Every structure is written in C-alpha cells, then in structure tokens.
C-alpha cells in the first residue's frame, strides 16, 4: 500500500459581512470546503492506497522537522494550488515577539522536496490558479529550485488559459501505464489549464487538443518519479472532470506508476 500526502484544494469561506453601523461590522459564518475529496476518494478507490489530505495552511504551519517527517513517511506527495510562498515563508517571520532575539530562519522546504525526490519520494504537481507560474505569476514554481524536479518548464508570466466551453486532451503516449483502460476521447470539458513547455529529457504523455501544450508529463529525477497534470483535479477547472467515468482509474493508474519502480 502506498501512502500519499496531498497538499491543497481546500478553501475557507468567511462571511457574509454585515455592517450594522459606520463603526460596527460582523462576519457571519465560516464554511470549510475540501475540494480535494474527489482526488482522495479516487486514489483510495482501489483499496491499495491511503491518502492524507491537508489544507495548504497546515503545510505552511508545519514546524521545523515536520516536512522532513512527512517526506520520510509518505511514498507520494501531491501539490495542488500551493503557491511558492508556502515553501519560502514561515509563520515565525511575521511574529513580532521573535524579532531581534536571534536570526530568524527556517528549513528550506523547496530544498527538502528536491532532495527527497532524488532519494526516492515521488511527487505529483497539479495545476490551478496558484500552480506552475499561475495567476499573475503567483504560483512561482519555476522561480524556485522546484524547477529542477518539474517535468515541464514554467512560463515567466501568467500562464492561465481558460474557456467557458472547455478543453479536450489527446494522448501522445497512449501505451503509457497512466492510460491503461482510459479513453481520453471521452474526457468531459476541462475549463482551464496552465500553459507550460515540454522539458528536455522528460516525457509528454498527453497534450491539450489543438496545441502542443503538455497536459500530462513525467520525469525521473534520481530515484524519484514525478508526474505533472497541468489542470486542476478538483473544481472549478475540474468540475466536470471529477464526475468522469475514468476519473478514479486515471489517478489509481498514476499512483501505481509512480510507486511501481
């Protein structure tokens, strides 16, 4: 059984906000959404794998040594809509009570992930507004050392391509184990994706129809395998995708391939 640590695809809705007077307002209600439940359920559907799904803010608040423990304990780590600031900043940097007492530093999460992949941890990078380079460049993956273990090259500017009519995909490597039992021609409309470029030495398994833009790409870095999917495995881009008949099988295939050696 593979153990998967899945970061991202959670959201909190705060409000609505009621302004009762010019000097008083109240936030009424808090609702937490786990948009990652579809991917978690899909991967676990075979009964062979176990997924721990955590919000991005839990990843951000891991204490020193916390990510090291995760990378040691889990076979696969998934990042979906996790902008680079969550790797590069730490809560202590904004705690004024700690200022001036001693130099504030934190273990480099990017470096830890890169080193873990070379030792044999496997990664999945998923698309979204805060993935790859992302909306207004907020994703920022390509501006970090993560680019060393990405099987695609990020653009240097906003990379979102969206359509209310959606996009289709086509397999360029239909014989790859990812597509075992999968017919990509039945894929429902995908409402957006991150535009990236193929990376030399890595494999593009599928492209977005009518383009050369990678949809699925893979790479081997040291002992670890990495899979990139350039759209979102969850709503909103994936609001049709999660109800596709082949959705669960696709992600089971993905994990099986990653850990298959």
Predicted regions: what they are:
Residues 1-8, 12, 122, 200-203, ...:
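Extracellular ligand-binding/catalytic regions of CAZymes and related secreted enzymes
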């Amino acid at each position: 059984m593979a153990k998967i640590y899945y970061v991202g695809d959670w959201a909190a809705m705060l409000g609505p906000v009621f302004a009762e007077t010019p000097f008083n307002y109240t936030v009424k209600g808090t609702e937490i959404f786990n948009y990652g439940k579809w991917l978690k359920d899909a991967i676990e559907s075979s009964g062979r794998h176990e997924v721990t799904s955590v919000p991005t803010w839990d990843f951000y608040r891991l204490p020193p040594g916390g990510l090291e423990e995760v990378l040691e304990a889990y076979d696969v780590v998934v990042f979906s809509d996790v902008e680079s600031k969550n790797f590069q900043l730490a809560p202590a940097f904004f705690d004024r009570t700690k200022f001036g007492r001693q130099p504030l530093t934190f273990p480099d999460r990017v470096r830890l992930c890169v080193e873990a992949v070379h030792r044999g941890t496997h990664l999945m990078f998923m698309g979204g507004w805060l993935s790859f380079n992302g909306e207004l460049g907020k994703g920022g993956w390509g501006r970090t050392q993560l680019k060393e273990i990405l099987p695609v090259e990020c653009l240097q500017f906003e990379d979102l391509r969206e359509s209310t009519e959606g996009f289709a995909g086509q397999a360029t490597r239909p014989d790859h184990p990812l597509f075992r039992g999968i017919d990509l021609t039945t894929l429902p409309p995908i409402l957006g994706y991150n535009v990236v470029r193929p990376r030399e030495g890595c494999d593009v398994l599928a492209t977005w129809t009518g383009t050369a833009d990678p949809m699925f790409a893979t790479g081997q870095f040291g002992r670890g395998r990495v899979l990139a999917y350039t759209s979102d495995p969850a709503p909103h881009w994936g609001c049709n995708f999660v109800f596709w008949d082949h959705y669960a099988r696709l992600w089971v295939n993905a994990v099986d391939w990653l850990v298959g050696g």
